[in-house]
Amino acid sequence: MAKFKIKTGDLVQVITGKNKGEQGKVLRVITETSRVVVEGVNVVTKHKRANAQGEAGGLVKSEAPIHISNVMLGDPETGKPTRVGYRTETVERDGKQKTVRVRVSKSTGKDL
């Protein structure tokens, strides 16, 4: 299973494809297929059939997943897409020293 720099809840921008330039929050990361579901991006219309429990059928709009290589993490300071780096910090928890990796914006150097 691959490790991704984009996590659920991140603000991302689509950098290629039919939704290029659109921004949204990551709702879900699908690691098996290397895809992400972004709020308000790549919206598709599906036909839903009415079922026996009384739910009405009709057209349902939902976000379809897009490949993770087509999105870039947005810098919280500038709002522009940025590359992601890591910095290690030592943090003291319960009297013990722990090393923690922190995601950092390559363009501004700020924590993400």
UniProtKB/Swiss-Prot annotation:
GO terms for cellular component: ribonucleoprotein complex; ribosome. One of two assembly initiator proteins, it binds directly to the 5'-end of the 23S rRNA, where it nucleates assembly of the 50S subunit. This is Large ribosomal subunit protein uL24. It comes from Kocuria rhizophila (strain ATCC 9341 / DSM 348 / NBRC 103217 / DC2201). The gene is rplX. Part of the 50S ribosomal subunit. CDD domains: KOW_RPL26. Residues 92-112 are annotated as: Disordered. InterPro entries: KOW, Rib_uL2_dom2, Ribosomal_uL24, Ribosomal_uL24_CS, Ribosomal_uL24_KOW, Translation_prot_SH3-like_sf. Keywords: Ribonucleoprotein, Ribosomal protein, RNA-binding, rRNA-binding. Belongs to the universal ribosomal protein uL24 family. One of its GO terms (molecular function) is structural constituent of ribosome. SUPFAM superfamilies: Translation proteins SH3-like domain. GO terms for biological process: translation. The keyword Disulfide bond does not apply.
